[in-house]
């Protein structure tokens, strides 16, 4: 009987301890850009190992989905690969840059051109140029692999290229016959499977595209590397930002943001093929 009482006491103590731990555990839910998934996945893996009382999660559904989720209290932090809109700032969104990225253009293996001008690139994206022959390639229709409109990459290309080259709103629109996919990985996969195709991805995915046998284009005779991006020779580049709302910030949120911008966090950014803010 005495042994049974001791066993019950030990089980009760264990359950009480576990419940207390669960009550004390802070959940930091993050949502946003698919581009930064490799960075966030590795950061979270390392952070969760050294912070027993905090569990960080990442839901890569796109920059706009992440920011909307922040305002709707689904996420405590959003990660965006596009700039905040005026409306988002007015709603209380606050940004912190934690990395830099460039958008690079990849083509299927049979496209042998190595360089393209910004103007011709923009004309491919809006449909003014329809055949590879018009830019020195084979006589074949151009198949364009595009991102969905909630993607930060989609918005960034529109701002950095289409709006830069074209003067009217009508011209600065993506062509309607693009094949729409939801992530950088899907762009690489679709481009590898679709003859005579072109798509765009983040710099951190360059190695993956090369492994698939795809070509990376120089733009205005400049190949995208960390050096040409840092020196502003390659100009199709953007900030990767942490988005918070002052109304919902707490200590667990600020601690993870501090980790992201720390030397350890920045090493992870570089390891994943992107550019750190302290580069």
Curated annotation (Swiss-Prot):
Lipidation (N-palmitoyl cysteine): 19
Keyword line: Cell membrane, Lipoprotein, Membrane, Palmitate, Phosphate transport, Signal, Transport
Lipidation (S-diacylglycerol cysteine): 19
Membrane topology term: Lipid-anchor
Primary localization class, coarse: membrane
Keyword Cell membrane attached: yes
InterPro entries named among the record's database cross-references: PBP_domain, Phosphate_ABC_transporter
Gene Ontology BP terms: phosphate ion transport
Top-rank lineage group of the source organism: Bacteria
Residues that, per the record, bind phosphate: 33-35, 63, 151-153
GO MF annotations in UniProt: phosphate transmembrane transporter activity
Any one annotated GO CC term: ATP-binding cassette (ABC) transporter complex
Membrane listed as a keyword: yes
Signal peptide: 1-18
Assembly: Monomer (in vitro). The complex is composed of two ATP-binding proteins (PstB), two transmembrane proteins (PstC and PstA) and a solute-binding protein (PstS).
Stated family: Belongs to the PstS family.
Protein's job: Binds inorganic phosphate with a Kd of 1.2 uM. Part of the ABC transporter complex PstSACB involved in phosphate import.
PANTHER family linked: PERIPLASMIC PHOSPHATE BINDING COMPONENT OF PHOSPHATE ABC TRANSPORTER (PTHR30570), PHOSPHATE-BINDING PROTEIN PSTS (PTHR30570:SF1)
Protein name from the UniProt record: Phosphate-binding protein PstS
Native source organism of the sequence: Borreliella burgdorferi (strain ATCC 35210 / DSM 4680 / CIP 102532 / B31)
């Amino acid at each position: 009987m005495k042994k049974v009482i001791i066993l019950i006491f030990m089980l009760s103590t264990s359950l009480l301890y576990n419940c207390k731990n669960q009550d004390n555990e802070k959940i930091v839910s993050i949502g946003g850009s698919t581009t930064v998934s490799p960075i966030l996945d590795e950061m979270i893996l390392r952070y969760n190992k050294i912070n027993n009382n905090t569990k960080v999660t990442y839901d890569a559904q796109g920059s706009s989905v992440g920011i909307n989720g922040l305002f709707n209290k689904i996420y405590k932090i959003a990660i965006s690969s596009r700039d905040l809109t005026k409306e988002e700032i007015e709603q209380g969104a606050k940004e912190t840059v934690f990395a830099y990225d460039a958008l690079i253009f990849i083509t299927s293996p049979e496209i042998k051109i190595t360089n393209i001008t910004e103007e011709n690139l923009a004309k491919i994206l809006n449909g003014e140029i329809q055949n590879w022959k018009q830019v020195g390639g084979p006589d074949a229709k151009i198949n364009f692999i595009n991102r969905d409109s909630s993607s930060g990459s989609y918005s960034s290309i529109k701002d950095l290229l289409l709006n830069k080259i074209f003067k009217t709103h009508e011209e600065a629109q993506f062509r309607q016959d693009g094949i729409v996919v939801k992530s950088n990985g899907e762009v690489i996969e679709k481009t590898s499977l679709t003859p005579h195709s072109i798509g765009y991805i983040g710099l951190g995915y360059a190695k993956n595209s090369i492994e698939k046998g795809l070509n990376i284009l120089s733009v205005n005779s400049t190949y995208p590397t960390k050096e040409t991006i840092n020196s502003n020779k390659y100009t199709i580049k953007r900030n990767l930002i942490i988005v918070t709302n002052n109304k919902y910030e707490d200590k667990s949120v600020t601690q993870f943001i501090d980790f992201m911008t720390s030397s350890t966090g920045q090493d992870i950014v570089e390891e994943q093929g992107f550019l750190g803010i302290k580069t």
